């Protein structure tokens, strides 16, 4: 038994001994939320498991304490989770924009991992995995009953190793198995930057997620578009599962004056834990007309950007209702090399609107059929910013088409207004 576990057990035994001696003194009523009785009960259950469980190798103190910790967090909410040393290291790799896996973004829904998006040219995309697919079994382990982080980690591993997944595809009502080889992935967070219409100066870019490099990637894309006489901009957040709040704040800062509230983190008893404000940046396009494209796979940090620019009337939102993930997880170091990912707050928009469980309703709702949504999600990876690529079975991007129309109308209104002002 390790020294750490011995110390824990010693404390537990001391607490039990002290409580057992209380009847010899004056009666003391325990606090309503006192840990003493619970610790006694837990320790008793621990001993019973150790004495009677059939597979003795499974009930070491180390494994039991880890299982207890996982179970405790699992019952709180879908996002709180314990991260072992291995998992914690992978988390740090992901926030740097690098990871080993198959290149897929997932969310937990109905006991399965629902695919929100796949990285362009990733192993997942090459194997035929599509947005909307429901992953039910990973290397023989059912997803049902697992937390999001726990299930998603099963898709990761070492470079060159394969993972076998069993999935259900709602769009075709089919079940299938896929075996995919893991690779080292470099996450490209800003793609497809281009001028769509030179006459109006309508530009386009897609933010696939908010990673450590997003602000840098965004600045490069914007600088290139500005050189091409950018007058109007469409930012595509469809299929963006979120990421780092700090980089979403940086992205908003490019389109707002400095010191504007972007998002507030509200904790227990409505206490404001932190208020993120827009920053002063080299590239600032606070007067540039914007459209944001969103859908049901736009989540978390992407919803922060959407809600912020909507509240300040800086952008017209077009598409479908967003996902509705508006809770904050803090990664708290636990021990020397482990961590607990714990929900500590809710996101609130600048106008104090809550995102969690509600999502954001676009200003212009354009609902797609499941089949069209499914086809378009895959198409965006290779042909972002194209209304209808010259491909067999290509679908027309009616949401993008509407965005272009809206921005042209905005430009016409501005040009007319400016002309009237000049002639007065």
Task: Give the residues covered by each predicted segment.
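Short acidic, Pro/Gly- and aromatic-enriched capping/linker segments at domain boundaries
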Residues: 334-345
């Amino acid at each position: 038994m390790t020294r750490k576990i011995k110390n824990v057990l010693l404390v537990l035994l001391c607490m039990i001994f002290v409580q057992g001696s209380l009847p010899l003194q004056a009666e003391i009523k325990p606090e309503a939320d006192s840990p003493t009785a619970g610790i006694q009960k837990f320790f008793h259950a621990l001993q019973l498991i150790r004495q009677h469980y059939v597979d003795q190798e499974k009930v070491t103190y180390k494994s039991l304490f880890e299982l207890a910790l996982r179970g405790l967090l699992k019952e709180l909410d879908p996002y709180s989770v314990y991260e072992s040393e291995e998992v914690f290291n992978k988390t740090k790799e992901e926030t740097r924009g690098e990871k080993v896996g198959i290149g897929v973004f997932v969310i937990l829904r109905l006991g399965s991992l629902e695919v929100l998006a796949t990285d362009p040219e990733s192993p997942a995309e090459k194997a035929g995995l599509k947005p909307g697919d429901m992953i039910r079994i990973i290397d023989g382990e059912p997803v049902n009953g697992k937390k999001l982080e726990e299930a998603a980690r099963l898709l990761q591993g070492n470079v060159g190793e394969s993972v076998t997944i069993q999935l259900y595809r709602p769009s075709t009502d089919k079940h299938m198995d896929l075996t995919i080889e893991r690779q080292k992935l470099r996450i490209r967070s800003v793609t497809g930057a281009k001028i769509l219409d030179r006459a109006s100066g309508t530009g386009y870019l897609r933010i696939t997620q908010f990673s450590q490099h997003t602000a840098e990637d965004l600045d490069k894309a914007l600088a290139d578009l500005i050189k091409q006489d950018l007058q109007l901009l469409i930012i595509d957040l469809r299929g963006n599962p979120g990421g780092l709040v700090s980089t979403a704040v940086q992205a908003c800062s490019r389109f707002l004056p400095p010191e504007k509230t972007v998002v507030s983190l509200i904790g227990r008893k409505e206490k404001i834990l932190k208020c993120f404000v827009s920053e002063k940046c080299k590239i600032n396009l606070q007067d540039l007309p914007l459209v944001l494209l969103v859908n049901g796979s736009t989540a978390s940090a992407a919803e922060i950007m959407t809600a912020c620019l909507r509240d300040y009337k800086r952008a017209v939102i077009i598409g479908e209702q967003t996902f509705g993930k508006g809770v904050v997880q803090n990664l708290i170091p636990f021990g020397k090399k482990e961590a607990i990912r714990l929900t500590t707050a809710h996101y609130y928009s600048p106008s104090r609107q809550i995102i969690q469980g509600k999502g954001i309703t676009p200003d212009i709702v354009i609902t797609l059929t499941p089949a069209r949504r499914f086809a378009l999600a895959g198409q965006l990876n290779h042909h972002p910013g194209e209304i209808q690529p010259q491909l067999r079975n290509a679908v027309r991007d009616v949401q993008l088409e509407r965005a272009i129309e809206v921005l042209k109308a905005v430009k016409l209104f501005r040009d007319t207004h400016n002309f009237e002002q000049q002639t007065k």
